[in-house]
């Protein structure tokens, strides 16, 4: 089980990312726009605005965690579980449609 503080930190990052998502997206779109090209000084101002946003609001700072244990590694996106929790749940027939492989 991951520390509670790490799980809370990750939740805080998710909230920040959702809060600043549209702002970050619009600034990036304006910087990359080829339809109405900006001058160099305008682009630097846009980049400064982008850099002034909180670091934890960047989507690259997010990390998937197992929603049961909070483990940050070996996560399966389809289930939202880490590998060993997924394996245990499949063995106990708690996941519908998932079966053990045998050959």
UniProtKB/Swiss-Prot annotation:
GO terms for molecular function: rRNA binding; structural constituent of ribosome. GO terms for biological process: translation. SUPFAM superfamilies: Glucocorticoid receptor-like (DNA-binding domain) (SSF57716). Residues 34-56 are annotated as: Disordered. It is found in: Plastid, Chloroplast. InterPro entries: Ribosomal_uS14, Ribosomal_uS14_bac/plastid, Ribosomal_uS14_CS. The keyword RNA-binding applies. Its main location: plastid. It holds the Pfam family Ribosomal_S14. One of its GO terms (cellular component) is chloroplast. Keywords: Chloroplast, Plastid, Ribonucleoprotein, Ribosomal protein, RNA-binding, rRNA-binding. The keyword 4Fe-4S does not apply. Binds 16S rRNA, required for the assembly of 30S particles. Part of the 30S ribosomal subunit. Belongs to the universal ribosomal protein uS14 family. This is Small ribosomal subunit protein uS14c. It comes from Brachypodium distachyon.
